[in-house]
């Protein structure tokens, strides 16, 4: 682990896993198109990424032009996180990137390969983070929306602009939602890749046509706090109710409320039990934990008999 992400030295090859900055040479892997995993490409090195990731990156203002989806003994593996998200398998090493093994609407859970060395994220690597089933979540949210509709209240579902907003668009399409303009742009790109998301108006057009005055209605918007000007406007003018979605909503230790009227646990990452299942399915000899509760999850795995350690800066090259 370095200040520029995870670097693995395997034989004569140098592999940069989700580097924060472009590298001049070696092999780089970009697992998915969330902003904390992207960088502008430069140099002569080989960059491995999915086509979906590169297209979403361009939409978000990043330049990834020269890339490969296949290279020698490197295999990308579906990570189930967002559209185009991949893990990387090479030399019996599996790097998960951000991963979810749970099916969520159109998003299918990750493919999990056997490996000798597992480098896994553990965003929710604490036992308190065990999420409700998708069916239970959808049922609960539909009940909330129905109750609010009965009172004539418009509802805004809030989730990350890339990934969760598309899951929400799919799961609650029967309410014929409007989309925040930024969500609409991402949804259109998802449709380009065959994801069956319903077309709808963006919020600017819907408001300009007076459609938001015809309450109740549903809207899918990016994750924003109650202090955001857009949310304050929607509440003051239309008396809208907000429902925020995040894995952090599972824990009372984290104040995910952020001024939302409701907070619902829903994540594009593995929960604690799913992380344990991931480890069992990989059946590795060595485990490195990255991103999240790295110390706690590694300690739990060690108690279960695994050879696990949190990945700190400059620690990985000593072992791989």
Residue ranges with predicted function:
Residues 38, 85, 103-104, 164-168, ...:
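Short, well-ordered alpha-helical microsegments
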Residues 41-43, 110-114, 172, 233-238, ...:
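Short, conserved loop/helix-junction motifs that constitute active-site signature segments
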Residues 1-21, 67, 104, 192-217, ...:
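A short, well-structured beta->alpha microelement
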Residues 2-23, 27, 33-156, 163, ...:
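His/Asp/Glu-rich metal-coordinating catalytic cores
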Residues 2-3, 206-320:
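C-terminal regulatory/interaction regions
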Residues 45-55, 119, 176-186, 244, ...:
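Short internal beta-strands
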Residues 81-91, 99, 103-104, 117-124, ...:
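Active-site-proximal loop/helix segment associated with metal-binding centers of metalloenzymes
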Residues 1-3, 111-112, 126-201, 206-211, ...:
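Binuclear metal-ion centers of metallo-dependent hydrolases, dominated by the metallo-beta-lactamase
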């Amino acid at each position: 682990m370095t200040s520029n992400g995870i670097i693995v030295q395997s034989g004569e090859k140098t592999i940069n896993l989700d580097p924060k900055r472009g590298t001049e040479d070696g092999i780089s892997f970009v697992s998915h198109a969330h902003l904390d995993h992207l960088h502008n490409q430069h140099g002569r090195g080989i960059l491995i990424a999915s086509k979906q990731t590169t297209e979403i990156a361009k939409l978000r203002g990043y330049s990834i032009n020269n890339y490969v989806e296949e290279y020698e003994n490197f295999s990308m593996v579906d990570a189930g996180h967002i559209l185009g998200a991949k893990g990387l398998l090479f030399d019996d090493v599996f790097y998960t990137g951000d991963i979810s093994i749970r099916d969520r609407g159109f998003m299918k859970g990750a493919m999990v390969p056997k490996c000798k060395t597992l480098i896994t994220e553990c965003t929710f690597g604490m036992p308190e983070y065990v999420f409700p089933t998708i069916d239970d979540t959808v049922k609960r949210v539909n009940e909330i929306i129905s109750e609010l509709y009965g009172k004539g209240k418009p509802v805004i579902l809030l989730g990350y602009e890339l990934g969760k907003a598309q899951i929400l668009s799919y799961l609650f399409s029967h309410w014929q939602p409007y989309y925040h303009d930024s969500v609409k742009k991402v949804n259109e790109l998802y449709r380009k890749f065959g994801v069956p998301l319903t077309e709808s108006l963006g919020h600017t057009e819907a408001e300009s046509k007076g459609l938001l005055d015809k309450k109740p209605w549903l809207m899918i918007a990016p994750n924003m706090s109650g202090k955001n000007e857009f949310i304050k406007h929607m509440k003051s003018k239309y008396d809208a109710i907000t429902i925020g979605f995040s894995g952090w909503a599972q824990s009372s230790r984290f104040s995910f409320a952020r001024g939302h009227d409701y907070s619902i646990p829903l994540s594009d990452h593995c929960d604690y039990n799913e992380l344990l299942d991931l480890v069992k399915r990989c059946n590795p000899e060595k485990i490195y934990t990255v991103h999240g509760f790295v110390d706690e999850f590694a300690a739990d795995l060690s108690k279960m008999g695994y050879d696990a350690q949190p990945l700190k800066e400059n620690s990985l090259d000593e072992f791989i």
